[in-house]
């Protein structure tokens, strides 16, 4: 059972890792290593760890740690439906939304894999009706835009995936609807999003598993008022993605409802109905199905016990080594692909909400560090922003690069002897070597110490399958790290206290004087 799993500091392999001498990246990084230190992933991707400060002796100990903690076995139990979310006594079934890898998971007599597949098929049929004009807005106009209303996992993942797939869909001629996303309760966000929409031709997708999310329901009201102001029937322009037990389920205020359940956490929900509706409407079911196929294939590879053949497991263990042996508190995600512009923000939530924990699965304080701080931006933009600190700052920040040989689009020209894609990838290669090897200079201001660890996920082109594999890779990496740290990666109690205090302020029941004072300072109005 997860509750009986040991802490990291109890591991003999971890103790041996702590005793290993420092590895000089400047010596280690050679052309032969760049070619050899690589693990295949799904959809033609590869995980390259040549610029990581580890040698065979490190990998042997990390393999021992994986075996000692039965990391793949814990993953198998999760797939079989064991209640790995020990804090909420729930199963963890996001893998099942893209395919079956273990036995059938039953709940109250229902096959949950079949339930997720049924919801996908309902969504695909609905999207097809919208695309052929069988379902229209209340004015009779065909829907040409879709807007997802949601926050957190109901926004970050689907938004990142939409942006990542948009150029690929255009290349294939299947950008069927444009999408917008409304998340923040800041009224200016709603104003700006609504100003970009033709409301008569817009279908809104309200996403709230509980049906009670404050920010989402507030924005829903703003949308309904805007629709009515234009003489439109708001009920014809909204569908809901929710749980079957929420107040939104089967509600006549929505044109239709599509379902998820409590076993799929918000930040892991992009391959459930949460992502399926908006992506199938925008690009058609085939693109979303390709995304699912890539994710499922990567999930299957994550069952490989040998870390030298399991990129997600190796990436997880290298991250633990960087965090708990070398003591690095941050990690930067740096995609050299503008299509992945919002992918770091999604990974920030995925990682920090999952592994930002300070107690183990028994509720005991952790005697070691857990999840790192995650941030990032696409290259080459980041090079002209925060890379200065990454190269010469006093803190070492490990780096996760992502790059592709080809652009998604076809429009690229030779400029000064090279294409834009050539320039992009030349910058990526240069950064990998610069971070690892540095440069000696008598002028201290121009001296680069190097020794900055980095990994690279590379592929031919960012396709829907590759994006699915990339998504699943990071989800599984984070899962494995949670197992190593003996924490529950599948709850988020840290976000609850702020919600409680917000509710007190808005209801006028706050008793804390400092809370009341901040409310007054920010011009909070007394409850109506």
Go through the PLM ranges and name each one:
Residues 161-166, 195-199, 221-223, 255, ...:
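Short, solvent-exposed amphipathic alpha-helical segments in soluble enzyme
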Residues 144-152, 204-210, 330-337, 373-374, ...:
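Short glycine-rich or small-residue beta-strand-to-loop segments that form or flank ligand, phosphate
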Residues 13, 21, 54-61, 74, ...:
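General structural feature for long, well-ordered alpha-helical segments within catalytic domains
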Residues 124-133, 139-306, 504-507:
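Glycine-rich phosphate-binding loops that contact phosphosugars or nucleotide phosphates
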Residues 226-411, 450, 497-501, 506-528:
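Active-site phosphate/pyrophosphate-binding segments
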Residues 391-394, 402-461:
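Substrate-recognition/cap regions that form aromatic- and gly/pro-loop-enriched pockets
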Residues 4-139, 144, 417-428, 435-437, ...:
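Extended, charge-enriched "interface" segments that sit outside catalytic cores
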Residues 455-527:
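C-terminal helical/tail subdomains of lipid-metabolizing enzymes
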């Amino acid at each position: 059972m997860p509750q009986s799993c040991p802490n990291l500091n109890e591991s003999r392999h971890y103790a041996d890792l702590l005793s290993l001498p420092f590895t000089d990246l400047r010596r280690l990084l050679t052309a032969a290593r760049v070619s050899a230190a690589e693990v295949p992933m799904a959809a033609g991707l590869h995980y390259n760890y040549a610029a990581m400060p580890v040698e065979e002796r490190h990998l042997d100990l990390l393999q021992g740690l994986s075996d000692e903690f039965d990391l793949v076995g814990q993953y198998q139990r999760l797939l079989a439906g064991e209640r790995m979310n020990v804090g909420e006594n729930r199963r963890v079934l996001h893998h099942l939304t893209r395919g079956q890898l273990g036995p059938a998971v039953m709940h109250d007599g229902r096959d949950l894999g079949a339930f997720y597949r049924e919801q996908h098929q309902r969504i695909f049929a609905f999207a097809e009706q919208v695309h052929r004009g069988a379902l229209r807005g209340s004015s009779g106009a065909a829907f040409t835009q879709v807007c997802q209303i949601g926050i957190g996992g109901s926004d970050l993942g689907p938004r990142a995936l939409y942006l990542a797939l948009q150029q690929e869909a255009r290349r294939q001629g299947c950008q069927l609807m444009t999408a917008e996303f409304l998340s923040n309760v800041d009224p200016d966000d709603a104003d700006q999003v609504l100003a970009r929409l033709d409301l008569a031709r817009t279908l809104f997708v309200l996403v709230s598993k509980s049906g009670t999310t404050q920010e989402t329901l507030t924005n829903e009201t703003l949308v309904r008022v805007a629709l009515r102001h234009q003489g439109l029937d708001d009920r014809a322009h909204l569908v809901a993605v929710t749980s079957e037990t929420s107040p939104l389920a089967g509600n006549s205020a929505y044109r239709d409802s599509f379902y998820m359940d409590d076993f799929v956490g918000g930040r892991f929900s992009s391959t459930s109905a949460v992502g399926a509706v908006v992506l199938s409407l925008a690009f058609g079911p085939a693109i979303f199905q390709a995304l699912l196929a890539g994710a499922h294939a990567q999930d299957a590879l994550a069952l490989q016990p040998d870390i030298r053949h399991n990129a997600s497991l190796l990436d997880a263990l290298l991250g633990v080594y960087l965090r708990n042996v070398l003591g690095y508190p941050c990690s930067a995600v740096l995609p050299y692909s503008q299509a992945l512009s919002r992918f770091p923000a999604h990974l920030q939530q995925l990682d920090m909400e999952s592994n930002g924990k300070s107690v183990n699965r028994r509720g005991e304080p952790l005697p070691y560090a857990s999840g790192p701080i995650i941030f990032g931006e696409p290259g080459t933009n980041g090079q002209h922003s925060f890379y200065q600190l990454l190269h010469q700052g006093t803190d070492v920040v490990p780096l996760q690069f992502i790059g592709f040989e080809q652009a998604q689009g076809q429009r690229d020209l030779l400029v000064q002897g090279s294409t834009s894609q050539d320039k992009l990838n030349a910058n990526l290669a240069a950064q990998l070597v610069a971070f690892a090897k540095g440069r000696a200079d008598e002028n201290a201001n121009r001296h680069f110490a190097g020794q900055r660890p980095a990994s690279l996920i590379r592929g031919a082109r960012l396709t829907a399958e590759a994006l699915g594999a990339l998504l699943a890779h990071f989800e599984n990496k984070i899962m494995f790290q949670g197992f190593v740290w003996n924490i529950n990666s599948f709850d988020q109690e840290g976000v609850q206290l702020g919600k409680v205090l917000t509710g007190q302020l808005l209801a006028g029941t706050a008793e804390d004087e400092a809370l009341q004072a901040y409310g007054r300072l920010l011009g909070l109005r007394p409850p109506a």
